[in-house]
């Protein structure tokens, strides 16, 4: 609605099934088009853990500079289970057991990307491929009593993302995220460690976890991906001939859930938290797979850490594999 300073407005209404156990920190809480393994044609195990969400929301984003944005979201959500027979989100509050909730939330976010190359006009700006850090801070307040809001809580989240060039060793992509929820809240408001039951790669998710296998109200996650480019592959004749490139990945999650939130849980989800043992996954892979100049694909071989002795499987969840193979594609020319 204004060019300088750049101000944009977004409004959305949606009524759909969503997978809330796939991503944590979002700046604009309007629609998450990647929300859920339901978009995967081929997936591991069954997925009964979808939520039925009716959402009305608005976003106001101030581009104070090209690389510093301040935003405000106002969201009204009616949250219920998509199938009460298989997935309960019941919650005990004020001597009552609730099975669906009206969540009214306000959040403010800051997005700082120093050194990013920004160009173009209109709503969708373009960004250059130069390397730069990204810092995100977000505060969310759940408000009770306004517009029928039933939940009262505060949530703080922060993330840091950057790619480092390590000379001939290649480049290292890093992503750290931390968050804390204050208040007694039901499962959909807690932070489920992001999982991916599909066989395709999805950023910032754990490939060998089922949805809601791990839940926390305080968490720390790290995702690291190192692209060796030609440092390793040039030393292996067959790999060099096929023009493949090698990579290595490591990701971890640590978190805890307060006893008050555990006591209020009436869902059929076990509140496993990676507090006594950090959960991690590691892997190696090949990228630049294709023919000629069309080389969009990569294959990752992934292993996971041992599960905690206290870990309990959720109903209808498949047994976690110790090893998996995932395929990714990144079209670019």
Where are the predicted features?
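Exposed, low-structure sequence patches enriched in small/polar residues
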Residues: 1-333
